[in-house]
Amino acid sequence: MWSGLLPPGLNESDVESDSEDEIKLENPEPSEHNLQEDGKTGSSTKPAVSDFPTGQPETETEADADAYEKCPSGIPLNIWNKFQELHKKNSEQKNSTPRFRQKKRKRSKKGKLKNEKESHSEQSSNETQWEELTQYFGANDRFEPPVKQKKVEKSGLEKRIDQAVEEWDVEKAEELSNQLATRELGVKIAKAIACHKFVKAKKEAENSQAARKKKKLAWGFEAKKRWETKSNMGYM
């Protein structure tokens, strides 16, 4: 409304119609074209997630929303989270298995070296024992009578060997001869062990006797005192 008088050529009805037009222009009705434009501009003007400050912690609703975005449709959220945890544990175990394998390999190498050392030490000890026994092979042969004077009776195994040779059964004769050789070697080893034990016991007895002689006094107390008095009398 105009204050005071109206301009020439205008009535109050004209002024009211102009004011209504101005109101319509200020607040126009939304059309379809305007709605589409508003939708485009609104989508572009929506604040993105990165526009928010990063220092603030996310709320539960935002975390749930992110989880639901990652979770496929038709699967509950708790099952999806459990699946993710299991997947993470599986990947960690796969990454940690090569270390355990390397440790096992190192342990197996150490065990092999230890077994080799033990076998080598056992072999060396067996060799030393065998060398000690071989020294006594045939040690008592000189006490046996000569072969001409000795009556030799064949054993059952020797008779079977002779029978196999007469029958031209070479394989059987070889097998029986091997058995005879092992038997003779066993007899030699048994005699060598007995001789070794005898020598060892004899040495121990000699050593103990020598130790007793060392411990025994050269003279008694009275003889020593008498000798001391005689030596003192010479200086008087």
From Swiss-Prot:
Gene label:
Fam204a
Provide the organism lineage as a comma list.
Eukaryota, Metazoa, Chordata, Craniata, Vertebrata
Compositional bias segments (type: Polar residues): 122-132
Feature: compositional bias, Basic and acidic residues: 22-40, 141-158
The protein's organism comes out as Mus musculus (Mouse)
Q: Provide the coiled-coil residue spans.
A: 101-167
Q: Does the keyword Cytoplasm apply?
A: no
**Which parts of the sequence are annotated with region: Disordered?**
1-158
Basic residues composition-biased segments:
100-112
Task: Alphabetically list the UniProt keywords.
Answer: Coiled coil
| InterPro entries reported for this sequence | FAM204A
What is the protein's name according to its record?
A: Protein FAM204A
